[in-house]
Every structure is written in C-alpha cells, then in structure tokens.
Amino acid sequence: MKRIFIPFALIIGATACGISTQQEVQMGQEEAAQINQQLPLVRDAEINRYINLLGDQIASRTSRADLDWRFYVVDAAEVNAFAVPGGYVYVNRGLVERTDRMDELAGVLGHEIGHVVLRHTVKQMEKMQGANIGVTLACVLTNVCNSGLAQAGINIAGTAVFAKFSRGDEAEADAQAVKNTVAAGIDPHGVITMFEKLIAERKSRPDAVSAFFATHPGEEDRIVAAQAEINKYPASSLRNLTTNTTNYNSFRARIRSLPPSPPPRAQ
C-alpha cells in the first residue's frame, strides 16, 4: 500500500503538547480521505448501511461516542482490519466473509473501535514525533520526500496506522471489544469464536491470515484473556444477549454474492 502522510502543519502543531482530540479528528479526516482513494472499497449501499448501523450500535456505547464514526468494508480478500484515529474503521471483505454470526463481526468491530477509544495509534504517533520531527522538517524544506531518509522520518501517519500493536494494546482492545459489545446488547463470545477460527486457519492455511497476525500479535493467550473479561459478567446478564440477526444474514449473503475482490495493487 502506498504510504499516507499527515499534513506537516498538524505534525508541528501537535509535537509540543501532545495530540488533542481536535487534532486527532483532523488527522483522521486527512488519513481517511487518502485511504478511501487508495483502497478498493465496497460501494454497495446495503452493505455499507449495515456495517455502519452495527458499528454505530457498538461505538455509541463507548466513552468516545461523540466521534463521527465511519465504517467501511474494503474489497480485499486478505484477512485484516484496522482503524484510523478519529473514528474510521476498515474491515477487509476477506475477514467479513469468515464471520458466521453477527456477534463475530461485532467482536471484530469492537476490537478496532477499542483501539480508537484508547487512542493507541495516537499514542504511538506522540512517541514517534520527538524522534522524527527533525527529519520531517528536513524533508519538507529540501523537497526530498522520496528519499530513504525522508521515508524513515516523515511517515508518522502510515507507520502508526499500520504498525504492529503491542500485546498490551491488543489485550486492551480485546477487553474493550467485550465491554462494548455487552453494552450494545451483543453476546461477547463472538470475540472468542472469531479468534478461534483465525487461529485454526493459521494452522491449516497460514498465508491466508498472515496479514492479520502481522498486525494483531498474540494467539491462544488472547482467547484466555478475553474469556477472563467475559467471566467478569454474571452468566445471567449474558444469557439474553444477541448472537445473530436476520439483517446480518442478509448482509453476509450480499457480501458473498459480490464479484471476486480485485487483485492487490502492486506496491
């Protein structure tokens, strides 16, 4: 994927005192605009309507419900998902097609929403800014943004968005997925069953899910941790939560009826 850059003025403005919510939202808007031009998004109105309804159902129960959340299905066969600061969540069609129930898709969305709620990418960017700001300045002033040196320094946005989160970040996002799905009235066990599927596929077809595990570290230990989060809730409080809906079934059938995803673009 072509790297995506945050405007220089935003980087300078955020360096001295951290990244505010307003700056995060503006960065996210810039980032998402470029991603939406570069990635093949599914344009089907019904598919987009459903993914946004389900995503909003979860995001509206979080501490950052005030963000203008947007959810997209990327028309790509590889299994992956990611989120951009400010409330932009992208799920690859290949991952959606591996879900069999609504609660599994909700678990995926809840996890990516969790990264935004906890500002994981923003925190990575804040750490990187101090080291990279000098190279960024040199790149802008000397117009050598395609050089290896510039690529190493200026690409704060692209590196942060597509970075491999730490195991701690992933565990926190998993805990958020459980918390937020429960708050939305959705069975949190989809978080676990989805991950079990991907781990099983990794053993039989590792290439099919390599992109997902490259950006989402951890395996069985995350299942144990997610189950521990679920166990914090009385069993009686989870008994009547939703696992599946007819709307999800229609959404999944529509996804699977689409023409094959386009081949990946040359890097």
Predicted segments — roles?
Residues 2-6, 17-267:
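A Zn2+-metalloprotease active-site environment signal
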